[in-house]
Amino acid sequence: MYEQHVVVTTKHGQMPAFVACPDGAGPFPPIIFYMDAPGAREELRNMARRIARHGYFCILPDMYYRLGTVLFDLPRRTDAMSAVIRASMNSINNELVTDDTSAMLGWMDANDRVKPGPVGCVGYCMSGQYITTVSARFPHRMVAAASLYGVLIVTDQPDSPHLLVDKIKGELYYAFAEHDAGVPGHVIPDLRAALAKTDVKNTIKIFPGTQHGFAFAERADYETVSAEQTWADMFAMWDRCLK
């Protein structure tokens, strides 16, 4: 497998990213991996490698680059660390991530290992909002977007991602935990209602008995069967839309 740490120039600075793809010349269909709130780490790089082994070029950006190098030792997580994670999460928003996505698309367009044209993406936790937003902002590029236990997809703010779904041309996949304090009870019905007014092909699943984070193998709430089902669902969508 080919893998490398790269730097993508954005409107706001230099954004480090990890990339992985199969050995060989390619080109390979691209997947953007938007991180969860605790940030870029080896656990996510291993997940990016899994995507690459399936025949994709995966790019995992460090979305906290504006803050410098931010790393969290999650096994030693404390209340103070959680507060810093929340502050880091709040340092970015839909517009900033849209800017970063534009930069990544340009970077990939200039990379010979990346297949030109349609792009897939996945976002965990805080990035559920972002995969929805970028699918609307780049409707002719983002053709297959997945969200796992995504938060802030439906809010009362004017930039709430669910208000943009009528602009999406690609396919959407949302996997929610049954128990998730970050997803109030109105979110899934409101998201379903917004999508029902469009022609967007979408799948919304709620995985019984799961908690937020159920697809992260290093979390206490990891659920193998549900996690593997999300992988199967995502690969089926990406293969259908990108290969």
Model-derived features: where do they sit?
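N-terminal cap/leader regions of alpha/beta-hydrolase-fold enzymes
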Residues: M1-K243
